[in-house]
Amino acid sequence: MLDFLPLTATTATHQHPRLTWDIFCQVIDNFGDVGVCWRTAAELVERGQSVRLWMDDASALQWMAPPPHPQGLSVHGWPTAHAQLPDVLGDVVVEAFGCEIPQVMKQAIAQSPSKPPVWINLEYLSAEDYVERCHRLPSRIMSGPAAGLTRWFFYPGFTPATGSVVREQNLGARQQDFAARRSQWRAAHGVQGHDCAVSLFCYEPAALPQLLDQLVSAPALSPQLLVTPGRAAAAVQALPQAEPLKPRYLQPCPQPQFDEMLWACDLNLVRGEDSLVRALWAGQPMVWHIYPQHDNAHHDKLDAFLDWLKAPPSLRAFHHAWNGMTSPQTLPLLTPEMLREWQACVQAARESLATQSDLIAQIQAFSAEKR
């Protein structure tokens, strides 16, 4: 078992005036899109803001963030008529992941008798060079009901010249509280003594059979595989290699419990944007299954992340095989020494992120600047 090093507890940052935020999210990857939008909305509310979250599919919130929701945070269906809009527009409108806000909302913004809201396009997370160049750039609307208005690009990222990532103000305190009961969590999930707990949250990686074969034949690791529900569970259950491992199939859980799983495990294989950030904050060895794109544009995005991470050769090779950039047979053999090297790498990256102003603080300051 690897030690778990909690983040340092921090004090609350500067409180901004209370604003009303309208966040729009069209779901593509149900867990990642919903996860990022919910964490953003919830942390804005935690810092004194009021948020309306507009979604075309909020079904995942039933288990990811079950009610009661925090006071000041409300969830709404995708509006298609003016009657579904609030009587008073909010102060800030956020298009998450480049989604287009509804035409009725654009019309309402254009016809607003008062100053229009700050309009922000919250983009996908990336470590690629263009993020620093495009962060905070304006984009003037040239046609349609909102012609003449300006929206602003806000790019999450990994460097001080970007919008950074979501980090809750109480994250360090939560991790320190969990550290005292981490052994109990592991025991309750079938992880004994010095077992190597491996969490699996993925799509359908071609190298999954190779990973399972490794874990079966790795007595030095004493692996215990914890499999998240959905596509990861279906992929594992379809493979005969999994049977000797006796995987534990987890149930859907709220976000705080997902975080605790990452903190409890010794290796986290995660997918998408939200769980990548959570795995970095966990500070444990991690492997990212990036969302695949048909033109393989995700290959450059993955390599840019690995460059920022300063990934050692074994971690880079594992990512390449796990993401189909190289043959599944090239998947490096996991060893305790390798995991310790990966842990040091992730913790160094986490330390770098922790020195930056977090995404919520930055987007609040940006909105105040543009109002």
Where do the model's predicted regions map?
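Active-site and donor-binding regions of nucleotide-sugar-utilizing enzymes
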Residues: 24-148, 230
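A donor-sugar binding/catalytic signature common to diverse glycosyltransferases
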Residues: 31, 38-41, 254-301
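Catalytic donor nucleotide-activated moiety binding site of glycosyltransferases and closely related
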Residues: 221-251
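C-terminal amphipathic helix plus adjacent low-complexity
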Residues: 311-371
